[in-house]
Amino acid sequence: MKKIKFYETSKLNKKYENNFIKNIKKINQSGRYILGQNVNIFEKKLADYCKSKYCVAVGNCVDAMKITFMAYKINGDLKDGDEVLVPANTYIASILGITSVNLKPVFVEPDPETFNICTKKIQTKINKKTKAILAVDLYGRPADLFALKKIAKKKKIKLIEDAAQSLGAKIKTS
């Protein structure tokens, strides 16, 4: 059996190395490691790139998921014990973000072609406790957001997208 090598990001990142090291030195010399000017610049640039009014940088995916789900709970859209459909092959951070605010993850098998949450299998998991779908975009490929939006609208549940691995990806509209 032939071994398939895991993708080596070091090769992809090599062209950014000098700039990365220069900026790390600059931050290290400033003594400001939390918030500060660099975070403000990053948030502004990312908001502009995403054509969004706002951007809030967080330390990791667990924090991002936790803040998102907490906001829905504060708004009254979610409550303790509500179920969130999530891809079975997602990273643990998705699950920790859900469980850390007393919500229940319900695993949905991935689509074998895209490895994203399977829109057909989602239908079998939705019940009266289901209040949200967490679409986790994997390997640079967005989930089928058109189908997921239709399902969420029809079932009157929330759709949350974790696009950390697909930032900048485009979805065909025709």
PLM feature spans:
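Active-site phosphate-binding strand-loop segment of PLP-dependent enzymes
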Residues: 113-174
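Generic structural signal for small/hydrophobic residues in well-ordered secondary structure
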Residues: 8, 24, 46, 64, ...
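Structured catalytic cores of enzymes that bind and process phosphorylated ligands/cofactors
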Residues: 8, 54-57, 99, 108, ...
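N-terminal "arm"/small-domain region of PLP-dependent enzymes with the aminotransferase-like
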Residues: 1-32, 37
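Phosphate-binding glycine-rich loop
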Residues: 32, 36-83, 97-101, 107
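Short beta-strand->loop structural element characteristic of the AMP-binding/adenylate-forming
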Residues: 104-114
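Conserved coil-to-alpha-helix start sites within the AMP-binding
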Residues: 89-95
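PLP-dependent aminotransferase class I/II
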Residues: 10, 22, 39-45, 49-55, ...
